[in-house]
Amino acid sequence: MPNFNRHQIRQAAFQVLFTLNANQSLELEDAYQAVLTMDQFDAEEVTPVEVPAYLAFLVSGVTENQAALDAALTPYLKKGWQLSRLAKPDLIILRLGLFEMQNSTEAPAKVALNEALELAKQFTDDQAKGFINGVLSKFVEA
């Protein structure tokens, strides 16, 4: 099994959640393998990869607690805005960051916030990164 650091696991969590959002008929295990075996793209036969426990924790946590996460995030949107108006990558990063901030015993809230901003830097634009920082920082202060 490849060794994944926490940052790579968070990237994979984002990618799995994004994949599931885009293709809701996809099985969770298939989404994991699609993301975790990307480096085997050219291989004739793909070798399945064991899903790291922290990745499963993040993905299952976000999917199982999506309604509660959305309810917690909604008050921090601009007046008249709804989560459905947000770009999907931004919403997924917000959910992932908030879940980790509230539920991980391994990453302090400030670390989870910083990691969410790293994901935003990689998967969104500067304006979205500022928005994500503004929303999630409210939960660090709380």
Swiss-Prot record:
Disulphide bond pairs: none
GO BP of this protein: DNA-templated transcription termination; transcription antitermination
InterPro entries from the UniProt entry: NusB-like_sf, NusB_fam, NusB_RsmB_TIM44
Segment forming the signal sequence: none
Keywords: RNA-binding, Transcription, Transcription antitermination, Transcription regulation
GO molecular function terms attached to this record: RNA binding
Name of the protein in its database record: Transcription antitermination protein NusB
Protein's organism: Latilactobacillus sakei subsp. sakei (strain 23K)
Gene name in the database record: nusB
